[in-house]
């Protein structure tokens, strides 16, 4: 069966969904065959690591019987969002393995893609909120009160989940399954009702979900870095640096990883829009955009499994929390004993 690139599985009306010359640009059959065979395995691996990693992060944050600080509230919500997201990846992997033949019905077609779309918004809005909180702590420390920030963080997270869900409604409503008799498949497609929806979609996807948040992230983190440079001399006098500096270093790493993982997706999504409105044409652009979108999707998926790794390797305070949780959950009989206590036990054992 010939490959059917995703660009041709998305259109503004039924007559344009499967053009007669659709196979004229099938210039990369080997690349598509390799993608169908290899990419699902990588996606399942991401799902496994993301599921275990984000569950672990949530357990570390939520099991101890104490209130979360502001940064932990945001990071726990980010882990929860990633966890919900990776649960939908096996369906995506099976879809690619079947060469875009969707076997799960219309409801799951809408639900899975709606979850993916909601995660896109929730994740980047949480990154903005985290950056804004660090900005307030480091740049305007006198204006931020801990109790007020904690309450604000909870409200902000609830609003982000609600807004992310609302922004995913168009995807939920416009996704549908469509039979393709020529290829003997049933595809899960985004069926746009009018040409104007292409513009609305790119405004939502590239501007609302990336460029505007990116501008806010750059603004906040530029001032954060400037503030950290100003405190460099003070930090050198402290052993290991301040707690705020450690938390900020972790968050900056998360921000950079998020942008690296998601920027290619938005780049190819914009190229897809240009192709849809025929600003760019030709078989080269079609194959380049189709294959690029699949690889960019994969790179974006990795962000959900990469965050727990960043917590472990870049988050010194997170590692401390893991150790505290381990000591809390380990029975006292299994806890490590001091050398002096061990010596006393040894002497008592051999004493007659």
UniProtKB/Swiss-Prot annotation:
One of its GO terms (biological process) is response to mechanical stimulus. It is a multi-pass membrane protein. GO terms for cellular component: external side of plasma membrane. Keywords: Cell membrane, Disulfide bond, G-protein coupled receptor, Glycoprotein, Lipoprotein, Membrane, Palmitate, Receptor, Transducer, Transmembrane, Transmembrane helix. Residues 1-41, 94-110, 175-206, 272-294 are extracellular. Gene3D superfamilies: Rhodopsin 7-helix transmembrane proteins. Residues 63-72, 132-153, 228-250, 316-352 are cytoplasmic. It is found in: Cell membrane. A lipid is attached at residue 329 (S-palmitoyl cysteine). The chain crosses the membrane at residues 42-62, 73-93, 111-131, 154-174, 207-227, 251-271, 295-315. GO terms for molecular function: bradykinin receptor activity; C-C chemokine binding; C-C chemokine receptor activity. The keyword Metal-binding does not apply. Glycans are attached at residues 13, 21, 184. The keyword Ion transport does not apply. PROSITE patterns: G_PROTEIN_RECEP_F1_2. InterPro entries: Brdyknn_1_rcpt (IPR001186), Brdyknn_rcpt (IPR000496), CCR1-9-like (IPR050119), GPCR_Rhodpsn (IPR000276), GPCR_Rhodpsn_7TM (IPR017452). Disulfide bonds join 109-188. Belongs to the G-protein coupled receptor 1 family. Bradykinin receptor subfamily. BDKRB1 sub-subfamily. This is a receptor for bradykinin. Could be a factor in chronic pain and inflammation. This is B1 bradykinin receptor. It comes from Macaca fascicularis. The lineage of its organism: Eukaryota, Metazoa, Chordata, Craniata, Vertebrata.
